[in-house]
């Protein structure tokens, strides 16, 4: 609906892309974000029910606990993203099998990052209401300032700097490039490889920190 509404008033310099085509990758990113948020909310519910305490005293490694939660949340996010990708032709986007495979791979990487971030926040939250508050002031701005709604190049200078320091901006960049460029071309694209390195590093960092936090703070 937003793509249709802004289609005649949006244009990129030197591009013939309509807003629906520009915004579509942003919706995929939003699906990954919200799936991660809602899958990690269950961590708080598990603590309230006493289930998490039982898991922590069981003879399993902290790594297994974190990996299971993060991979489960990522699987849910990936399923939602794949379903949404099936509707890409409605936005005027034609995807080849190679592009689809690349997009699914990127969704896994980004989903791991979002779920790892959600895990870290949920681990310190005592109530679902508190988690929702963090979601409003932290998670949503990450998406809004990622270039999902408007290009970084067209933003005010100060806002552009903020967006460049946002790791989700680079996740948005690799997704958008995967939608509109051939995978064979992206292998040699420095901009794509740089953004992929940042997005992948961010995902690895959130997962590593999640494991360290669980090992450090097990008194739930």
Language-model segments: which ranges?
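Transmembrane helix segments
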Residues: 2-7, 122-169
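Membrane-interfacial helix-loop-helix junctions in multi-pass membrane proteins
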Residues: 11-14, 147-204
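Residue-level signal for alpha-helical transmembrane segments in multi-pass membrane proteins
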Residues: 1-4, 86-91, 145-146, 176, ...
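Short helix-terminus and kink motifs of transmembrane alpha helices
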Residues: 38-50, 115-122, 129, 153, ...
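Hydrophobic alpha-helical transmembrane segments of multi-pass membrane transport proteins
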Residues: 1-4, 19-91, 118, 137
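Short amphipathic alpha-helical coupling elements at transmembrane boundaries
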Residues: 49-57, 126, 136, 160-164, ...
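Hydrophobic alpha-helical transmembrane segments
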Residues: 1-17, 218-220
């Amino acid at each position: 609906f937003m793509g249709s509404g802004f289609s005649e008033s949006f244009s990129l310099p030197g591009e013939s892309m309509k807003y629906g085509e520009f915004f579509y990758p942003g919706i995929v990113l939003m699906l990954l974000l919200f799936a991660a948020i809602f899958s990690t909310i269950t961590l708080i519910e598990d603590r309230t029910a006493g289930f998490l305490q039982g898991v922590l005293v069981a003879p399993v490694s902290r790594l297994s606990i974190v990996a299971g939660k993060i991979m489960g949340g990522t699987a849910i996010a990936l399923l939602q993203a794949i379903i949404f990708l099936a509707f890409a032709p409605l936005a005027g986007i034609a995807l080849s099998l190679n592009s689809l495979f690349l997009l699914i791979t990127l969704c896994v990487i980004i989903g791991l990052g979002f779920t790892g971030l959600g895990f870290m926040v949920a681990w310190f939250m005592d109530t679902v209401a508190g988690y929702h508050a963090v979601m409003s002031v932290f998670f949503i701005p990450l998406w809004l300032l990622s270039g999902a709604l408007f290009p970084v190049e067209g933003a005010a200078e100060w806002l552009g700097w903020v967006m460049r320091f946002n790791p989700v901006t680079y996740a948005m960049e690799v997704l958008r490039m995967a939608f509109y460029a051939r995978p064979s071309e992206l292998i040699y694209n420095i901009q794509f490889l740089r953004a992929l390195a940042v997005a992948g590093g961010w995902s690895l960092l959130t997962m590593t920190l999640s494991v360290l936090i669980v090992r450090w703070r097990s008194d739930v």
